[in-house]
Amino acid sequence: MPYAPGDEKKGASLFKTRCAQCHTVEKGGANKVGPNLHGVFGRKTGQAEGFSYTEANRDKGITWDEETLFAYLENPKKYIPGTKMAFAGFKKPADRNNVITYLKKATSE
């Protein structure tokens, strides 16, 4: 099942409870345990400025878009073996769609 636009408000709520402890989204936001996600769409894996990535993330070589994030967020450690992202993933496609819809807006403002 591919990405389909979701509910931005539900995505914001999911991000706040499941992602924000490790990631920021605003321009110039700090890297935390995970990298700042501003500008993530169109960026290659392992390229957020000032963040120390694993070799696996740097070498994956894919560009983040709706489809790659949809696959990654289902099971990050399966998609990029060796990633240090501890989050197990969003198993429900609707949750992934909602978070990605939120990220598309929040990481580009």
From Swiss-Prot:
Heme c binds at residues 19, 22-23, 85. GO terms for biological process: mitochondrial ATP synthesis coupled electron transport; mitochondrial electron transport, cytochrome c to oxygen; mitochondrial electron transport, ubiquinol to cytochrome c. This is Cytochrome c. Electron carrier protein. The oxidized form of the cytochrome c heme group can accept an electron from the heme group of the cytochrome c1 subunit of cytochrome reductase. Cytochrome c then transfers this electron to the cytochrome oxidase complex, the final protein carrier in the mitochondrial electron-transport chain. Binds 1 heme c group covalently per subunit. GO terms for cellular component: mitochondrial intermembrane space; respiratory chain complex. PANTHER family: CYTOCHROME C (PTHR11961). The keyword Heme applies. The modification N6,N6,N6-trimethyllysine is found at residue 77. It is found in: Mitochondrion intermembrane space. InterPro entries: Cyt_c-like_dom, Cyt_c-like_dom_sf, Cyt_c_1A/1B. Belongs to the cytochrome c family. It comes from the Eukaryota. One of its GO terms (molecular function) is metal ion binding. Keywords: Electron transport, Heme, Iron, Metal-binding, Methylation, Mitochondrion, Respiratory chain, Transport.
